[in-house]
From Swiss-Prot:
Its membrane topology: Multi-pass membrane protein
Protein task: Key component of the proton channel; it plays a direct role in the translocation of protons across the membrane.
Family assignment from sequence similarity: Belongs to the ATPase A chain family.
UniProt main location, coarse: membrane
GO cellular component: plasma membrane; proton-transporting ATP synthase complex
Keywords: ATP synthesis, Cell inner membrane, Cell membrane, CF(0), Hydrogen ion transport, Ion transport, Membrane, Transmembrane, Transmembrane helix, Transport
Bilayer-spanning residue ranges: 40-60, 100-120, 146-166, 220-240, 242-262
Organism (species): Shigella dysenteriae serotype 1 (strain Sd197)
Subunit structure: F-type ATPases have 2 components, CF(1) - the catalytic core - and CF(0) - the membrane proton channel. CF(1) has five subunits: alpha(3), beta(3), gamma(1), delta(1), epsilon(1). CF(0) has three main subunits: a(1), b(2) and c(9-12). The alpha and beta chains form an alternating ring which encloses part of the gamma chain. CF(1) is attached to CF(0) by a central stalk formed by the gamma and epsilon chains, while a peripheral stalk is formed by the delta and b chains.
UniProt xrefs under NCBIfam families: ATP_synt_6_or_A, PRK05815.1-1
Molecular functions (GO terms): proton-transporting ATP synthase activity, rotational mechanism
Pfam families for the chain: ATP-synt_A
Name of the protein described by the UniProt record: ATP synthase subunit a
Amino acid sequence: MASENMTPQDYIGHHLNNLQLDLRTFSLVDPQNPPATFWTINIDSMFFSVGLGLLFLVLFRSVAKKATSGVPGKFQTAIELVIGFVNGSVKDMYHGKSKLIAPLALTIFVWVFLMNLMDLLPIDLLPYIAEHVLGLPALRVVPSADVNVTLSMALGVFILILFYSIKMKGIGGFTKELTLQPFNHWAFIPVNLILEGVSLLSKPVSLGLRLFGNMYAGELIFILIAGLLPWWSQWILNVPWAIFHILIITLQAFIFMVLTIVYLSMASEEH
């Protein structure tokens, strides 16, 4: 176990605590005595998500500036493969005309993948540095295991769904879609509104919770292995799970991207 002074329950609970800032006092929250208030922010999730987003921009910009028509390097080849894969997915699933969808899909796929990839770091590495070097009370390094992050991303997708729906169908067409489907009669407007409203709202909710649930479960398994087993036996389970987890983090990034494209394609369809 990583800490001899903690029980397994304390160890697991410690690694599930976020580094929070109380916006009323601008002071760090004590994980052992959190305030019962809405006005807190998970600054570790904010730091790592923004940092990884900037890393994505810097890497792709540097490759774009150094791109040549000759024989590309290994890193440039890998980037081109990712771009080609995402662009092909967009062409297959999005049938409207928009210059935003392909860059958006690429950003979502790479950004979510990088956030998920943080789950493969040794579970005690950064939290130990944060606690013993920086004096921080807690630290979680996987932004996509924070429901606030995943639902915020899903909210952004939801706003785009509304934007494309109104842009392609107009206010009247969008309103008619909500009130006159699936039953095309004025008497069923309340029923249609409930059904279509639930269907519309379920898209961002399921999108965000799916990513959160899978990444939270993956993070929890790593914590359980480290917290319940002696150090010399952790590798027996850690290595196979880490190898399998590479598939999970890639698949979850792909699913988030695909569902975003599909939802925006549905919103762009004219009826």
